[in-house]
Curated annotation (Swiss-Prot):
This is NAD(P)H-hydrate epimerase. The keyword NAD applies. Binds 1 potassium ion per subunit. One of its GO terms (molecular function) is metal ion binding. Its cofactor is K(+). Residues 11-217 form the YjeF N-terminal domain.
Amino acid sequence: MAAKYLSAANAAALDKDLMSMGAFSLDQLMELAGLSVSQVVYKVHPPSKGRRILVACGPGNNGGDGLVAARHLWHYGYKPTIYYPKPGKNELYQRLSTQLRNLSIPFTDDFPSAIKDSDHIVDAIFGFSFTGSIRSPFDTIISTLEATSLPITSIDAPSSWDITNGPPSSGPGANLMPQYLISLTAPKPLVRYFKGRHFLGGRFVTPEIHQKYNLQLPEYEGVDQIVEVPIEESEEKL
């Protein structure tokens, strides 16, 4: 089945509805999102391809998804390292960080050196709600992501991309094209500009929300929390 994509306004509204109509807490949604991300990494980069996963986290919910994904990856047998230069102030992010430290998962301040010791990168810096200019240190980090030959999995949006117009015309992120992208809940318009493998995660949307937004999403198989959705099947706007 073809997957429609959500406009910027509907994507933000749907997130609110998940917590009001759907009665989900932020903790639950972040846990489910991070679990989906970890399953994508396992699918496209199994441990046999290298266990060293560098997770670059921003200060918001996208970064929180990355922290959750790192915990699951550790339990799968990977060796994650966290780059988290500006930790979010929400108590939830602090607990997620503590959970990782309890597993002796290292945090690094040296992103360029960490890349040299990694096999795969999870881009959890900025999500679909990103707007404005990119501030330090993330401008340099995104430029480093553009230059690396390592495979990258981006969460909901390649960092710096606009939800509707895709990559910026210039500056950091203009040439960022990750190999893998996982859209959370439903694809966003930016997937039209994406050229890699595209996955969907969000096996928790209630029938009521499905109906409200007229979502047309592919079925998940078995116990999978993700499903691969070719870009050409994500074209009709909601």
